[in-house]
Amino acid sequence: MGDTAVPVLWGGDLKNTLDFYRTLGYAVTYEQTRPYVYGAVEGNGCALHFGAEPRGTELPAESVICLVMLDDVAARHHAFTEALRTHYGKVPAKGYPRITRFRPGQSRFTVVDPVGNSVIYIQRDEPKDIEYGGSRELAGLARVLDNARILRDFKNDDATAIRVLEVGLGRFGAEAPRLDKAMALAALIELAIAADDPARSDTLRTELRAMRLTEAERSAVEGELRAAADLAD
């Protein structure tokens, strides 16, 4: 039998933290408050443990990260979002706790628990080589879209993804293939909703609706818009 590594994350308000993981479908396997705080949960063969933060130390936000490799990241994200929607009345997308968005073909997502621990769920066969800046095999707005995807999905850097898309549309939008432009607008709609900017989202939707897209092209942007709809619900 091989070694088993168990991450120990910050516990915070332990009851609240364990309740959050119960909501996600984990089973609480240990809970102790005296003489010190310690708890543990387990789900799908994966254990997460929680200990007390060091006293007198101000912890940087989201400084503790755990990676969980799994076989079907899309199914897990769906299960988590449904559980969170049932518990909170909506899918929490900002602050603590929250879950990052998910689109068709995406290979990872992040759950940030009430304490600020980040648990990143990753498709086991995720490609090893990520070309930051966008794939060199692409050009123009297509490469901009790939760069924005990496910033958004791998670095959780929505602000930079927005800037990259806006600059890219300004530079390449006039000559870009119609579908690439529509995908860029759809991505910006989702990012505007995540940034709590409904006015910007409405403006972008108007621009997207004005585009004369084929049925196939409209179908291609539905995944991006579905992520936006999940945020708005």
Labelled PLM ranges:
Residues 29-68, 118-123, 178, 191-197:
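Conserved short beta-strand elements that form part of the metal-binding/catalytic scaffold
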Residues 1-3, 58-63, 103:
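Short glycine-enriched loop/turn motifs at secondary-structure junctions
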Residues 111-129:
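Short, structured interface segments
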Residues 9-48, 158-175:
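Core segments of cupin and vicinal oxygen chelate
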Residues 13-14, 66-114, 150-233:
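Vicinal oxygen chelate
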Residues 55-58, 109-117, 144:
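A general structural signal for short secondary-structure boundary/capping elements
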Residues 1-15, 97, 126-157, 164, ...:
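N-terminal beta-strand motif that seeds the catalytic metal site of vicinal oxygen chelate
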Residues 1, 20-34, 70, 111-117:
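Short charge-dense sequence patches
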